[in-house]
Amino acid sequence: DDAAITKQFTSAFTDKTKVVHITHMINWNGNLLPAKMIADEAKKRGIDVILDTAHSFGLFDFKLPDTNCDYSGTSLHKFLCAPFGSGMLYIKKDKIKNIWPLLSAPETQKEDDIRKFENLGTRSFASEMAIGAAVDFHNVIGSKRKEERIRFLKNYWTEKVTKNPKVKIHTSTNPKHSCAIALMSIEGWKPEDIEAKLL
């Protein structure tokens, strides 16, 4: 229930709340949170929104501006399949001037220029260059097609295992509330025993 989830966030807001952090897709159970609903409520109260898209970016078809977040960080090595250590920072244009990198940006950098965050020192240029190839590959497949395939695979295995009465799925089966990841348990088994058996 999107309204109930949103209420859990809004009930924790106070007059002192300046920023809310929302995990778009929870990594351990695969549940998708109603990020835009929560963000809309936060904005009504003057609260900035940070959206963690580490497990949603490149997985399903959405656009960051449509979530109404002010800031977002993501790992590009997950569902976008870029190299390890690559990531992306998104800051809404009108918020850029309010944030500065921990390492000093060049003096020539304007305060409202997102490139002020690119002063990273020594880094892997090979990894950076490979991001473009990963984006190209993702675009060849297509976001919607990729999402449909991943949903099919998750639904396939969850439907198979739930035929066993000892198996329980703890992730929503509603496509609006989950995508690729699902959490399961087996009666009489500890989570670490399931992990050891499967992996």
Provide a role label for each language-model segment.
Residues 1-199:
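Pyridoxal 5′-phosphate
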